[in-house]
């Protein structure tokens, strides 16, 4: 079985941060939201999923969960699993029928 996984920069696996390829863009996906600073001191934020639904879910999660409480986020990255819990085939906002589960942060 083929799987996608998130890893730390040193190549070690992040616990539970993986999914079988067969479910990605179907009824599940996983995404990362990461903030970092480059050598010139500029801040960058990345939001992306294993597939397009994960990337879409990342934007919705940032808008509804992270941004309203951004001053309380003291981590550089989070990994979240999205599940199409209501089975409608659409990426819903958090709290509107789909499940968003925080998997890891650092």
Residue ranges of model-derived segments:
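Solvent-exposed alpha-helical segments and adjacent loops
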Residues: 1-106
